[in-house]
UniProtKB/Swiss-Prot annotation:
The gene is folD1. HAMAP family: THF_DHG_CYH (MF_01576). Catalyzes the oxidation of 5,10-methylenetetrahydrofolate to 5,10-methenyltetrahydrofolate and then the hydrolysis of 5,10-methenyltetrahydrofolate to 10-formyltetrahydrofolate. The keyword Oxidoreductase applies. Homodimer. GO terms for molecular function: methenyltetrahydrofolate cyclohydrolase activity; methylenetetrahydrofolate dehydrogenase (NADP+) activity. This is Bifunctional protein FolD 1. Pathway: One-carbon metabolism; tetrahydrofolate interconversion. GO terms for cellular component: cytosol. Its EC number is 1.5.1.5, 3.5.4.9. Belongs to the tetrahydrofolate dehydrogenase/cyclohydrolase family. Keywords: Amino-acid biosynthesis, Histidine biosynthesis, Hydrolase, Methionine biosynthesis, Multifunctional enzyme, NADP, One-carbon metabolism, Oxidoreductase, Purine biosynthesis. Pfam families: THF_DHG_CYH, THF_DHG_CYH_C. PANTHER family: C-1-TETRAHYDROFOLATE SYNTHASE, CYTOPLASMIC (PTHR48099:SF5), C-1-TETRAHYDROFOLATE SYNTHASE, CYTOPLASMIC-RELATED (PTHR48099).
Length: 293
């Protein structure tokens, strides 16, 4: 593991997620095999109501990862013209199915469909991506709940690379229910002092330069540059923005900040693989409650 020093450094450490994700998947594979021997086959269901190709690619990657680890993964494609009623009915059906242990509602959704409203139909004990408002409320209250997997991946990466949090300053850029807000809550639970920045924040760099840990999750490529960071900062780049040549870039200008921060997650190969691994881990945790006594 890599320890990030608390003092300034001229070398930026790469905080990769591939090794961590591999370890989580190995644990998932072992647990899935044990559950299967006990008559419980872990099953994840992903509800899709879009023809967006990037979304389809992501869902297929989850299905492949699940299969490699011994989980079943059902892709429930309702079509891009699915109604709110049909999506809600499917989520309710899956929530009531004892053979299903994890449910994900994939975005984007058809026009007029409200994600939070629909996610409320996911049974909290199967809400492996922390989408149900009840799950988010329990997370904010410090009660047991599945955190959104991407937000959980941020904390898992920080722990894996032994980045201290208690008493440190955390700055989160972005306030979505998927990453920004839950990441801030998780940092608070680890005794960090947290600031959340958003589109109306004045003088963004004034806030981000104070960060010991900077989490960026807004979907704007190159938003964070050298002027926004300090040498002691550890930067977690959650952005995954497609490029014209088929690649991915983050919300952080890697060229600009490299050598100017203590640590930086790569895109791809940082938060992404850990997110997928944690979705499978959450599904295993849910399935374990179905284990025959």
């Amino acid at each position: 593991m890599t320890t990030i020093p608390s003092s300034a450094t001229s070398a930026t450490k790469t905080l990769g997620g591939t090794e961590l994700a591999r370890g989580i998947r190995a644990e998932v594979t072992s647990a899935a095999a044990e559950l299967t021997l006990l008559g419980v086959t872990p099953r994840l269901a992903v509800v899709v109501a879009t023809d967006d190709e990037s979304s389809a690619w992501y869902v297929r990657s989850i299905a492949r990862a699940a299969a490699k680890s011994g989980l079943l993964c059902d892709i429930v494609d309702l079509g891009a013209d699915a109604t709110t009623q049909s999506i809600r009915a499917e989520l309710q059906r899956l929530s009531a199915d004892p053979a299903v242990h994890g449910i994900i509602l994939q975005t984007p959704l058809p026009a007029g469909a409200n994600f939070e409203d629909l996610a409320a139909s996911i049974a909290p004990d199967k809400d492996v991506d922390g989408a149900n408002p009840l799950s988010l409320g329990r997370l904010a209250a410090g009660l047991p709940a599945y955190a959104p997997a991407t937000a959980a991946a941020v904390l898992a990466l920080l722990d894996h690379h032994e980045v201290p949090l208690a008493g440190r300053t955390g700055v989160v850029v972005g306030r979505s229910n998927v990453v920004g807000k839950p990441a801030a809550q998780l940092l608070l639970q680890r005794d960090a002092t947290v600031t959340v920045c958003h589109r109306y924040t004045q003088n963004l760099g004034h806030h981000t330069r104070t960060a010991d840990v900077l989490v960026v999750a807004v979907g704007r490529p190159g938003l964070i540059t050298a002027q926004h960071v300090a040498e002691h900062t550890v930067v977690i780049d959650v952005g995954t923005n497609p490029t014209d040549d088929g690649g991915l870039v983050g919300d952080v200008d890697e060229t600009s900040v490299s050598g100017r921060v203590a640590g930086l997650t790569p895109v791809p190969g940082g938060v992404g693989p850990v997110t997928t691994a944690l979705l499978l881990q959450h599904t295993i945790q849910s399935a374990s409650r179905s284990e025959p006594s």
